[in-house]
């Protein structure tokens, strides 16, 4: 029983067999945060959003204040762990690891960052045209 739990846990958490250098991680994380920041700005220009909708990106931290009723998303680099951390007012905190193909994946359930953002922002804005897949 214990070996099955440990084996399943190991399988679930081992998405990438490649170890990224610190420089590769920093480049990927910075690029991801920049693309996300640009897309959130595009969302503000292209979709009906709250007057409180605000995007700020500085020093490895992207903050998106959606509205008073929804709350604030914070997406940031966690360089010591080579991760991107997300704090979502809808789904809570998550830690994403970089996969070989350049996608950020949450080890606990295998969901990728773009998939979670698609689901949550499509619900928030009631619009299926939201698509983070090219921006993460």
UniProtKB/Swiss-Prot annotation:
Q: Name one Pfam family in it.
A: Frataxin_Cyay
Question: Would the keyword DNA repair turn up in this protein's UniProt record?
Answer: no
| GO CC, alphabetical | mitochondrion
Q: Which reaction does it catalyse?
A: 4 Fe(2+) + O2 + 4 H(+) = 4 Fe(3+) + 2 H2O
GO BP annotations, alphabetical order: determination of adult lifespan; heme biosynthetic process; intracellular iron ion homeostasis; iron ion transport; iron-sulfur cluster assembly; response to hydrogen peroxide; response to superoxide
| Organism domain of life | Eukaryota
Q: Give the UniProt keywords, A-Z.
A: Heme biosynthesis, Ion transport, Iron, Iron storage, Iron transport, Mitochondrion, Oxidoreductase, Transit peptide, Transport
EC number(s): the record gives 1.16.3.1
Give the protein's biological function: Promotes the biosynthesis of heme as well as the assembly and repair of iron-sulfur clusters by delivering Fe(2+) to proteins involved in these pathways. May play a role in the protection against iron-catalyzed oxidative stress through its ability to catalyze the oxidation of Fe(2+) to Fe(3+). May be able to store large amounts of the metal in the form of a ferrihydrite mineral by oligomerization.
User: Its quaternary structure?
Assistant: Monomer. Oligomer.
What is the name of this protein? Answer: Frataxin, mitochondrial
